[in-house]
């Protein structure tokens, strides 16, 4: 497995390429803002784009999706159904990103973890020792809960679930706010929100509201 992290757009977003090195079959995660930059990375590495994985449906994470659907007609697009209302248009080949489902491309097995909170349909994607957390968990931060479909209570439960991943699991967040990557173990030591979620629901809810 290999990963390319691409910083895109004016909001310090990350889009990702995730691929199986044996077959070069790849997924693009949260394609946004700079479609040509992402396409160049795909071409330079000789990758075969097989799917798009969306952590959630806010525009700053999906606004380059149509470009890749046009380039690859019939491209499977994975999104949790609870976030469909956020999309301006429905993908042509929409697949449900269901909690616990395993998505495969080449030899890659990518597990879907439903992590509502920032949006009702937010998910994280776990591949080997990497977890793509979208706007659920950042380095030193967590997602906002003051937007349509968001819930502080749901985010509390989602962060508690992520904290159960092995400490060596590498976090690949949806934005570069305090750093590009970290691990679950480091964040349990230094991320106030992850700490509060592990200790005090009332304290967590007070901190995020």
Model-derived features: positions:
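Core dinuclear metal-dependent hydrolase active-site scaffold
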Residues: 17, 101-126
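Hydrophobic residues at beta-strand termini and immediately following loops
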Residues: 6, 97, 184
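Aromatic/hydrophobic pocket-lining residues that form the small-molecule binding cavity
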Residues: 31, 62, 155, 159
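Active-site HxH/HxHxD metal-binding segment of metal-dependent hydrolases
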Residues: 12, 23-26, 33-111, 189-192, ...
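Conserved beta-strand hairpin/beta-sheet module of binuclear metal-dependent hydrolase folds
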Residues: 1-45, 124-134
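Metallo-beta-lactamase
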Residues: 114, 119-208
């Amino acid at each position: 497995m290999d990963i390319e992290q691409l910083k895109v757009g004016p909001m310090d977003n990350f889009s990702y390429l995730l691929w199986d090195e044996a077959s070069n079959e790849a997924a693009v995660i949260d394609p946004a803002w700079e479609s040509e930059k992402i396409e160049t990375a795909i071409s330079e590495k000789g990758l075969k784009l097989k799917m798009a994985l969306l952590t959630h449906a806010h525009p700053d994470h999906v606004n380059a999706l149509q470009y890749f659907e046009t380039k690859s007609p019939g491209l499977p697009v994975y999104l949790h159904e609870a976030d469909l209302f956020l999309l301006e248009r429905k993908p042509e080949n929409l697949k449900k990103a269901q909690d616990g489902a395993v998505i495969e491309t080449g030899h890659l097995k990518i597990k879907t973890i439903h992590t509502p909170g920032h949006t009702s349909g937010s998910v994280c994607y776990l591949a080997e020792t990497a977890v793509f957390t979208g706007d659920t968990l950042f380095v030193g931060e967590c997602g906002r809960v003051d937007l349509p479909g968001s819930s502080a209570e749901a985010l509390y439960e989602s962060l508690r679930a992520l904290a159960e991943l092995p400490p060596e699991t590498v976090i690949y967040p949806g934005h570069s706010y305090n750093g590009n990557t970290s691990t679950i173990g480091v964040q349990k030591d230094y991320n106030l929100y992850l700490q509060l979620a592990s200790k005090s629901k009332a304290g967590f809810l007070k901190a995020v509201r």
